[in-house]
Regions:
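Alpha-helical metal-binding/catalytic segments enriched in His/Glu/Asp
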Residues: 44
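Extended beta-strand/beta-hairpin segments
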Residues: 1-39, 49-122
Length: 122
């Protein structure tokens, strides 16, 4: 699996052989917590799509997933995320089903139904 930092507010996931790598276009580009958030959504979505594709006997050739986000203020936070999957080998008749499957990602559901977060000092 390869995660590429495609911008300050974007990542791309591409399935590759071997261990997961995180790549940046330059050494000064840092993998931020926001890149981690986008990566977790991309990886989770890939996982459910890959599982579905395996059971449906569909090829994932050429698949990639892009996630972009924007910020809001007061308080400073991620305001929205946009996930786009590119799947050239997906039969057009399966596109709507693939979108439904992608929405079943647990990270996606967590973002739609935020958990309670407790902060404590030890």
């Amino acid at each position: 699996m390869k995660i590429t930092l495609t911008g300050e507010n974007s990542v791309r996931l591409e399935p590759t052989d071997g261990p997961m790598t995180i790549e940046a276009p330059s050494p000064d580009r840092q993998y931020s917590p926001f890149h981690m958030l986008g990566s977790s959504l991309a990886y989770c979505t890939f996982s459910v799509l890959y599982s579905w594709a395996t059971h449906a006997d569909l090829s994932i050739d050429g698949m990639s997933i892009d996630v972009t986000w924007s910020f809001s203020e007061e308080p400073h936070r991620v305001q929205d995320l946009k996930l786009t999957f590119h799947w050239p080998s997906l039969p057009p008749a399966r596109l709507n089903a693939a979108k439904r499957v992608a929405a079943m990602c647990t990270v996606h559901e967590t973002l739609l139904h935020p958990p309670t977060v407790a902060i404590e000092a030890a």
